UniProtKB/Swiss-Prot annotation:
Native source species: Mycobacterium tuberculosis (strain ATCC 25618 / H37Rv)
Record domain Era-type G: where: 5-176
Function noted in UniProt: Exhibits GTPase activity. Binds RNA but is probably not involved in ribosome assembly in mycobacteria.
Gene3D superfamilies: 3.30.300.20, P-loop containing nucleotide triphosphate hydrolases (3.40.50.300)
Residues noted as binding GTP in the record, renumbered to the chain: 13-20, 60-64, 125-128
Domain of life: Bacteria
Lineage, broadest ranks: Bacteria, Bacillati, Actinomycetota, Actinomycetes, Mycobacteriales
The protein's name: GTPase Era
Length: 300
């Protein structure tokens, strides 16, 4: 009988390198927020990949970056705490962008603070976005940048190309161990955290670059509708830092907030498996990213 292997894999990389999309592709369900805006992941969400022979627990962290605010510093601290406690670090570098200072900075951080006994796998993401010769050129550049990688694996989370190969590579690097989670469980995040992330993702679609860093979502209340077994009421608040940002989220005559509500409600109904009434309110918490008390109140 084959020995069972299990362990924790942390995906790191600069913002917007496809880490959350890759997590969802590996798990086969939506457990991490995806957006075209950088630094949209706020919590270390664990996705779980099940097999008869192994179990991979994926930790999807915020993008590691040079911090400009207290929130940015806390997010970076979260990343470092996470990869100090994992078996494999998956460094994500996209195929469609040249290696830049941000990538080099992260590699240096891994060299200087990453645990010596942790396996490093480099994942070249978004290979569907460029021709094959550019993928090959990026693989060469990555091998020159990261000389201590156990493997370099090119993948496309969008098309699924080589995702199975990546799973095999990650599983092979795990130690022998038990199944930490029951079969069929895809994440250990509470439903309220996932709901807040889904609302946040819907609110980030098609807005200006500065908004992601200024938008937080708090679930105020979740309760079954009295007399209706098939309906759940979800009340949530979207916090921004300035009145001008409140206008961006709400839109003209509330049109954009209604679009956000429709998109988020559909995702939450899929998550909960039932009909949902979603009530969204937009509030201003001035400069919350730099205020320790407000950061704590908003879940950071």
């Amino acid at each position: 009988m084959t020995e069972f292997h299990s362990g924790f894999v942390c995906l790191v990389g600069r913002p917007n390198t496809g880490k959350s999309t890759l997590t969802n592709a590996l798990v086969g369900a939506k457990v991490a927020i995806t957006s075209t805006r950088p630094q949209t992941t706020r919590h270390a969400i664990r996705g779980i990949v099940h097999s008869d022979d192994f179990q991979i627990i994926l930790v999807d962290t915020p993008g590691l970056h040079r911090p400009r605010t207290l929130l940015g510093k806390r997010l970076n601290d979260l990343v470092r705490e996470t990869y100090a406690a994992v078996d494999v670090i998956g460094l994500c570098i996209p195929a469609d962008e040249a290696i830049g200072p941000g990538d080099r900075w992260i590699v240096e951080q891994l060299r200087s603070t990453g645990p010596a006994n942790t396996t490093l796998v480099v994942i070249v993401t978004k290979i569907d976005k460029v021709p094959k010769e550019k993928v090959v050129a990026q693989l060469v550049a990555v091998s020159e940048l990261v000389t201590n990688a156990a493997e370099i694996v090119p993948v496309s989370a969008m098309t699924g190309d080589r995702v199975d190969l990546l799973i095999d590579v990650l599983a092979a690097a795990l130690p022998a161990g038990p199944a930490y989670y029951p079969d069929g469980e895809l994440t250990d995040e509470p439903e309220e955290v996932l709901m807040a992330e889904l609302i946040r993702e819907a609110a980030l679609q098609g807005v200006r670059d500065e908004l992601p860093h200024s938008l937080a979502v708090v679930i105020d209340e979740v309760s079954p509708r009295e007399g209706r077994d098939d309906l759940i009421d979800v009340h949530a608040a979207l916090y921004v830092e300035r009145d001008s940002q409140k206008g961006i989220v709400i839109g003209k005559g509330g049109a954009r907030l209604r679009e956000v509500g429709t998109a988020a409600r559909s995702q939450i109904e899929n998550l909960l498996g039932t009909k949902v009434y979603l009530d969204l309110r937009v509030k201003v918490a001035k400069n919350w990213q730099r205020d320790p008390k407000q950061l704590g109140r908003l879940g950071f």
